[in-house]
Amino acid sequence: YFNPEYEIYTRYKTGDTEKEGLSSPIVGRMTEDKDGNLWICTEGGGVNVYNRKDNTYRWYRHEEGKNSISHNNVKAIYYDRTNEIMWIGTHLGGLNKLDLRTNRFTVYRMKAGDPTSLPSDIVRDIVPYKDKLVVATQNGVCLFNPATGACQQLFKETKEGRGIGMVASLCIDKDGTLWIAATGEGVYSYRFDSGKLTNYPHNPANPNSL
């Protein structure tokens, strides 16, 4: 924690147990639930939930043979406040749905030969769009339907979209445009209403490009 106004730093250390601190020194994305708890993605330590009121931690880590998170390398997280669902994207473990009311996990993974499954088990970002989720993966972007568990891969069959493989980050702006950070391909914008996909690549000859 850092407060730039007062130059106050607080360090949150790792530990061997939940009572001692974080489960991993490598942390990534975070979100906050309705109770003010911080949900922290880690690399190798699963998801850590930090209760700021009583300064305690809860770890969600993979446990073989039990209902648990599918992988401990966690890259993305999105909190559905209305339905009390935490959506968790993992590296090699697919997409996880944690129902906070029951504390049960449901895992969605890539299935060979099934076009309605995830395009990759490496999930890098999750953003909401209407009643669905836009999911960034190592193999493009898909529109995930939480009600059915089915994925619709976006623009992969189009000429403009074939080059989109590994996607690092997503953002939907106030006008409903989806912005896609594609590794090695620059930035794309996508309009759901028209299906228009536009690429903004790096051009060494153009100093005004990315």
Whereabouts are the PLM-identified features?
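Carboxylate-rich, polar loop motifs that coordinate divalent cations or form catalytic acidic clusters
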Residues: 1-210
